[in-house]
Structure formats: C-alpha cells, structure tokens
Amino acid sequence: MQILQKIKNITLTSLELIHVRLDMARIELVEQKNFLITLLSALFVIFILLLVSFISLLFGLNSLLDPETKQIVFFAISAGAFFLILILLLLMRKILKKQRNFMVDTLTEVKHDIQAIKGALGSPSSKDQE
C-alpha cells in the first residue's frame, strides 16, 4: 500500500507541476502576442504618417524651390530617409534579438521538472541516457 500511495503522490505532484508550467507558458504566449500586435500596429501607423508627411513635404518643396536647388534638396531628403531607414532596421533587429529567448526559462524549468520526476520514480538519470 505504501508503494501505491507513493506512486499516487508522485502522479498528483507531477500533474500539478504540469498545470503550473502550462499556465506559465500560456502567460508568456499572451505577452508575446500582445507585444507583436502593439509593434505591428505602431509600425503601420508610423508608416502611414511618414508617407503622408513626406508627400506633403515634397509638394511644398517643389513649389518653393528654384530648379537648381531642387535636385540637391530632393537628393538630400532621399539620403536622409535612407539613413533613417537603416537606423530603424538596426533598432528592429536589436529588439527582435531580445525576443529570441522567448520561453527558454520555462522550457528549462520543464526539463528540470521531468528530471526530478524521473528521479522520484527511480528511472535512470539523464546522464545515463546522454
């Protein structure tokens, strides 16, 4: 009876642990989804506003500038916009690198839990399997 009770306790503990880990994974997935929605919404609004502002700027400059300075000004605007695009792409790359570690901690903890359960059941350790 004692062995049966031990197996029952290990099973219940394992199920509770799995439930907690799945809740943690769900919370991390919700946070990731919210981050992506916010990021994509902000990028869309920024793109539209940038497009409208540049079109207005170009129409205004076209009517104000004399023909000789138009080329210099328009090329400078194009070079400045290209430089800003490069900076924003580098910033986006940096932000996305931070997201690479998404759920790594949770998965590591799940692996530790599995090893602890195997140890409690008396099965061979992971060192023997690797």
Curated annotation (Swiss-Prot):
Cell membrane keyword on record: yes
UniProt entry tagged with the keyword Transport: no
Pfam families reported for this sequence: Phage_holin_3_6
Membrane topology: Multi-pass membrane protein
Subcellular location: Cell membrane
Keywords: Cell membrane, Membrane, Transmembrane, Transmembrane helix
Membrane-spanning intervals of the chain: 35-57, 72-91
Main location: membrane
Protein name: Uncharacterized protein PM0613
Species of provenance: Pasteurella multocida (strain Pm70)
